[in-house]
C-alpha cells in the first residue's frame, strides 16, 4: 500500500479583498450632489465647504459644482470643497 505522510500546516494562504480607496474625483472636475470625492481610512482629507463626511470618512459632494483641493491652517491640512457653478444669465 502506498502511503504519504501528512503534510505540515501552513500559516499563509489568506488575503483581504481590495477596498478601492483613494481620490475618485480630482480638482476642477464637475460633480453632482451625492458624488463620492474621496474614499479613505481616517481623515487624510477633511471636508470643506459643501462637503459631507460619512461614518467611514468618505467625502461626498452636497451640491453640484467643481471640486477644489486646498491646504490651510497652521498644520497645512488637506481640505476638499465644492465651488458652486456660476449661473450664466442672458
From Swiss-Prot:
Pfam families: Ribosomal_L27
Residues covered by region (Disordered): 1-22
HAMAP family: Ribosomal_bL27
InterPro entries, A to Z: Ribosomal_bL27, Ribosomal_bL27_CS
SUPFAM superfamilies reported in the protein's UniProt record: Ribosomal L27 protein-like
Full protein name: Large ribosomal subunit protein bL27
Gene Ontology biological process terms, A to Z: translation
Keywords per UniProt: Ribonucleoprotein, Ribosomal protein
GO MF assignments: structural constituent of ribosome
A single Gene Ontology CC term: cytosolic large ribosomal subunit
Matches recorded under Gene3D superfamilies: 2.40.50.100
PANTHER family noted in UniProt: LARGE RIBOSOMAL SUBUNIT PROTEIN BL27M (PTHR15893:SF0), RIBOSOMAL PROTEIN L27 (PTHR15893)
Family: Belongs to the bacterial ribosomal protein bL27 family.
UniProt keyword Ribonucleoprotein, yes or no: yes
Domain of life of the native organism: Bacteria
